[in-house]
UniProtKB/Swiss-Prot annotation:
It comes from Cupriavidus pinatubonensis (strain JMP 134 / LMG 1197) (Cupriavidus necator (strain JMP 134)). Transmembrane segments: none annotated. Plays a major role in the degradation of chloroaromatic compounds by channeling maleylacetate and some of its substituted derivatives into the 3-oxoadipate pathway. This enzyme converts maleylacetate and 2-chloromaleylacetate with similar efficiencies. NADH is preferred to NADPH as the cosubstrate. It comes from the Bacteria. It is an enzyme of class 1 (oxidoreductase). Its EC number is 1.3.1.32. The keyword NAD applies. Inhibited by p-chloromercuribenzoate and by 3-oxoadipate, and, in a temperature-dependent manner, by manganese. This is Maleylacetate reductase 2. Homodimer. GO terms for molecular function: alcohol dehydrogenase (NAD+) activity; maleylacetate reductase activity; metal ion binding. Belongs to the iron-containing alcohol dehydrogenase family.
Amino acid sequence: MTGDLNEFVAHFWPVRVVFGAGSTERIPAEVKRLGARRALVLCTPDQRDLAQRVLGDLGDLGAGFHDGAVMHVPEASVTRAAQAARDADADLLVAVGGGSTIGLAKALALHHGMRFVALPTTYAGSEMTPIWGLTADGAKRTGRDPRVLPSTVLYDPHHLTSLPPEVTGPSGMNAIAHAVESMYAPDRNPITMLLAEESIRAMAQGLPVAVDSPGDLDARTRTLYAAWLAGTVLGMVSMGLHHKLCHVLGGRFNLPHAPMHAVLLPHVAAFNEVAAPAELGRVAAALGAPGPGGAGAALHALLRFTCTERSLAAIGMPAQGIYDAAEHALADAYANPRQASREDIARLLRAAFTGEMPA
């Protein structure tokens, strides 16, 4: 599979998308359209104010809110949320937040058959994918199942204007990671590659502005559009070494999700450039840095401009965990254009640990 027009398979997921400033106001109408009686609003503790606003807008359709969403979706958090939904007699969820909250809604959809509406407040993109994740006993399991897709996604850039720079930068880099890995996925096709390039281009243009001027609505709209595209392609193709490493590090060391993606991405891109020069050349061009070997360096430059934490050490990775992580990364098969040994992965992680320029 080369990503050309000769032969490919494309699968598009049936998710309704409502995009634009002020789209939050349409949540009650979407809940009614789905025929729900009582909607429970999910969030993390720091999104409680927005969740309460959404609950107020729902009026008689609101069943309360549950603020127990946790990073990496621990099993215990799913059990608590399921009980909250039963206690509230809810037949629909409204997930307000980023990947943690949407991940919780996905787990409830998968294991308890609950439908949900998503209002993303970061660039994570999880809302557009059939990918779920669950953490138990220090390991994060992931899978794909169309049952975890939301019925409706509402993208409202107003909610990102309050996202601080230290969250905006890593979250945007996380979205770029989805698009970059889709460029060399074995099941890519011309449509996914076009969507990925447009996503990278839009995020690279808008993210520095959003970090520098968080209230710039045009920049927030552009970057949210980029995140939507990135999540869309993430849901259509398989991911490679980058996402595998993030699942391992997140599950074993509970590292913050978006900063982990941001730090690792330049190093994985540089590692893969020798095996996917054409695809990563297109990534470099979308980043505004055309030329051979440019993707890893351009991503590292964007990381340094938009993120304050630029190494695994800075986000809490223990140095002694490098070889353990490398070993676990080899435990399960994953698609990647370049085969990696344990020493290859350990070398990559050491460079990411110190934050040095990717080789």
